[in-house]
Amino acid sequence: MNIPFEMGYTFDETLREKPISLAEMKQGIAFLKEHLHEGSLYGKSCGLIGVYERIAGNLPESKYYLQAAIEYYTQTDNIKGIFINKLRLAHTYHWERKFPAANALFTELLQTLPDLPAYEDFFYQHYGKSKLDEGHFHTALSYFQKALQIRLQKGNEELIHSTKLCITYCMSHR
């Protein structure tokens, strides 16, 4: 579905996503909710709403929609959908500074990571950011370095740049 609003974001000085336009992102979230229907796109739409709600700072709504996506993908036995949305939920717990909940999800996801190697770099990037905010700089740096190795192989410059930002931030704050 094409969202007719600016849903882009940048990263702030603490490596958190920040909407290019908060007002437009909120309009985009409302648009997604208006078009949310049970069906083949339900899980994907709930996941997107959960991500955008987190970026917009509405963490309770983020958790609600990510949990709805996880439930949907669990019912349809979609392992990839479950993994992606549990990773997103861990990210929301991280933003809430609920590190035990975030770490429990990261630990669970680590067990299924061998089945979903395409998401390994995203896993290590998000886990690294959580560990960084938790004050575990050495662990965070090792996760960012793992993410960077994978991303260099993939060759996606935007992802490589975001991981290098994380490494630079980590090195300057330890």
Residue ranges and their predicted role:
Residues 1-174:
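Intrinsically disordered, low-complexity regions
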